[in-house]
């Protein structure tokens, strides 16, 4: 049996939501609309996303509705109880997460801090949400003098530990993070990722090094990626995908520096011969602009992505399918710095398909994973539906 598509390239525009989800009120996110609010006042068009049909999913500034879209289009709502990156990605690959990860807008509880201190023999300082560069500027010199651990968080369910490489050697920092990872698997903490954040330099001139290391949780069940790998298909993770799934179901992992490097890496992968999926996360939308409520930077990043689409399309093969989607929202005009509970856009196109139309909406991101699993004839997730039939493609 031949598969409809030999290769599927899945691109997650991290946090690029397309309007408040049906249960947004339960998350205090009424009125959120990342794409609309980001593009309001933006002076440039997004011709390639427009041509694919992004503006057909919902009315958007600078992205018009088109009569003949270049992709199948719809929007999906999230079933899982959470609006973080890991929950969104895990659901995309077929899981339904009913126990949300915890976030710590007021810092970590005293009980956890005490456990970390007694386990490591080092004092914890900072203990609040902050940007990594800001917290190192503030506490870096103190850390060098005392050997304390700079512990901080963000709007995501993460615990980050920063230390100067000359004060706490990398091996020790990694060992500390591994211990904290085990500690925080306890349901009362349930933190998604522990991140080692080493830095170097002198007071007033500290820089974070590339020796960052993430300690994630394994997904709470088998994903479509596991099924693909077990069936001999390639699963090429680009960007932070490998970290999000803790390596589960991944056959090759490629690191990226930023969105544009992510697109460069994807295009290089597309040029190779393989059978299976490539899976790219473009994190800058979320990390650099959404959390920082930088509307202008966010809009420009979407424009930069739009400009790369023709290059990607030029390298596609006849039996390739491209899927462009998101994992949650992060409305740059929303209060605070947290993600927003939103629909995600879904655009799917292939050189072998000439006529496109709207697809039915679904109430789970898992329909992306189900469609991929159906294409490769591997085990289907319990949640979601395959869009292959609606797309007019089937197994031969």
Curated annotation (Swiss-Prot):
User: Which biological process annotations from GO are given for this protein?
Assistant: 2-deoxyribose 1-phosphate catabolic process; 5-phosphoribose 1-diphosphate biosynthetic process; metabolic compound salvage; nucleotide metabolic process
Report whether Iron-sulfur shows up as a keyword of the record: no
Please give the catalytic activity noted in the UniProt record. 2-deoxy-alpha-D-ribose 1-phosphate = 2-deoxy-D-ribose 5-phosphate; alpha-D-ribose 1-phosphate = D-ribose 5-phosphate
UniProt EC number = 5.4.2.7
Keyword Manganese belongs to the record:
yes
Q: Where does Mn(2+) 2 bind?
A: 286, 291, 339
For this UniProt entry, the molecular function terms from Gene Ontology, in alphabetical order, are: magnesium ion binding; manganese ion binding; phosphopentomutase activity
Which InterPro entries does the record associate with it?
A: Alkaline_phosphatase_core_sf, DeoB, Metalloenzyme, Phosphopentomutase_DeoB_cap_sf
Recite the UniProt cofactor note for this protein.
Binds 2 manganese ions.
- Keywords per UniProt: Cytoplasm, Isomerase, Manganese, Metal-binding
User: What family does the database annotate?
Assistant: Belongs to the phosphopentomutase family.
Protein's recorded name: Phosphopentomutase
Q: Say which species the protein is native to.
A: Staphylococcus epidermidis (strain ATCC 12228 / FDA PCI 1200)
Recorded name of the encoding gene: deoB
